[in-house]
Amino acid sequence: MKKLLFITAPLLLSVLTASCSKSNVPPPTPLAEKPPRETFVKVIWKRKTGNGNGGLANYNVAPAYANDTVFVPNQNGMAYALAITNGKIIWKNDTGTNLSVQPNTIANAVIFGSIKGTLTAIDDKDGQTLWRTDAPSSIFSQPTIYDNSIYLQTHDGSVSAFDARNGSKEWSVANNIPEITLPSNSSPIILNNTVMIGNAFGAVLGFTIKSGDRTINIPIAISHGSSPADKMVDITANPMLYDHYLIFAAYQGAIVALDKDSGKMLWAKKASIINNMAINNGVIFTTQDDSELKAYNIQTGDTVWTQDTLKWRKITAPIYYKGLIVVADYQGYLHFFNSLNGEYLGRYKLTSKSDIFDYGISGQLVPTEKGIIIEADNGTTYLVDAYSNKVIYDSILSDYQVDKGKSVARIYPLEQDKPTKATAPLATKTTQTTETKSKGINATIIIGDFSKGKPS
């Protein structure tokens, strides 16, 4: 039986106070007329690959990269595969549904998710559809791959597991959601036979990997305010495991570090984070909801540096590349900072003003050893290289690694005449019936023992 540690909510109040919401958003900070020119940028190639997010901000489309191939989703349902060397189109597949997230890969399959809750597996070499299945609700976060399973949090709060070899459902757990939520969800992370997610109530939940029984509930943000917007404390940034630190961050809440084995809270700092984070050499890089960049020491939570040059410019999640921290903004600029001290090193205009929709960049940037892969909101995909002589670095990419477990070598296509019926575009607050029901947890917060062992 898995050991449980019980703790009451008041003990956490001192460090889990949520910040006030921004009812009146200031205008974006104007760009400097004479920015630093300490970064050298080269566009290696660019390719028109569909319609991007279709001008709709709730479509979190971004490329994925594996086996020298770039996989690009689009709001209109088109999926592309490009050669990393020159951007040449290898294949394209009309999935027949509105793709809404960054795909993930396993063996020879690329897993795409849609706003209608459809999961589609496509062969990475020839673009053939391998299988298709339905999730409980809209998919707004990248599917997580571990061993031969796909783990997913959908917008209705459900957490589900699917067999990556054929798309069959392994288990699904329904969870309540607040009155209003952000149009995004955090991806699950797998740790010690537990599927862990951050939910829209600002809590970390854990489920047994085999059956979906809920064993962990740790709040990292507490709602305040009178309006539904003021009470929003969604966890939408993907959790990160680095050494023995498990990092979660919430909107209008906090960024926290938990011990990966005991579940003990090591530190918590007030923050408001929506986008994914980056980690390198023991430093966590974040973009706050007001587009301030902030770096934290992973051991203590102390601030390493802050940078407010781009406040309110709707910048993307940060990435680490060649000693630089790189973000993009709503006007299609790339911005470069020294990862050691936050010094602003310059910008580069990637998209042109003639681009339709926003001509900006809002999706996740993807660093690779060949360059940074970028899908602009208008559907143009780029491979960009950048470096600065003011930055010294040991490796092109960060030292953060994602454990995908062990999977089969190949996934084969299923015989399907037509796509299965999708669910409604956006989930309501209604709790859905699922195969596995979550265990009720009321007044007491349950913090699970994260130590290794088979699930109970």
Curated annotation (Swiss-Prot):
GO cellular component, one term: cell outer membrane
SUPFAM superfamilies, alphabetized: Quinoprotein alcohol dehydrogenase-like
Gene3D superfamilies in the record: YVTN repeat-like/Quinoprotein amine dehydrogenase
Lipid-conjugated positions (S-diacylglycerol cysteine): 20
Record PROSITE patterns: PROKAR_LIPOPROTEIN
Organism: Francisella tularensis subsp. tularensis (strain SCHU S4 / Schu 4)
Record InterPro entries: BamB, PQQ_b-propeller_rpt, PQQ_rpt_dom, Quinoprotein_ADH-like_sf, WD40/YVTN_repeat-like_dom_sf
Pfam families xrefs: PQQ_2
Localization (cell): Cell outer membrane
Membrane topology: Lipid-anchor
NCBIfam families noted in UniProt: assembly_YfgL
TM spans (from-to): none
Function text: Part of the outer membrane protein assembly complex, which is involved in assembly and insertion of beta-barrel proteins into the outer membrane.
Lipidation (N-palmitoyl cysteine): 20
Keywords of this entry: Cell outer membrane, Lipoprotein, Membrane, Palmitate, Signal
Record protein name field: Outer membrane protein assembly factor BamB
Family, similarity comment: Belongs to the BamB family.
Signal peptide residues on this chain, from the entry's feature table: 1-19
Oligomer status and interactors: Part of the Bam complex.
Alphabetized HAMAP family for the sequence: OM_assembly_BamB
One Gene Ontology term from the biological process aspect of the record: protein insertion into membrane
Broad class of the protein's primary localization: membrane
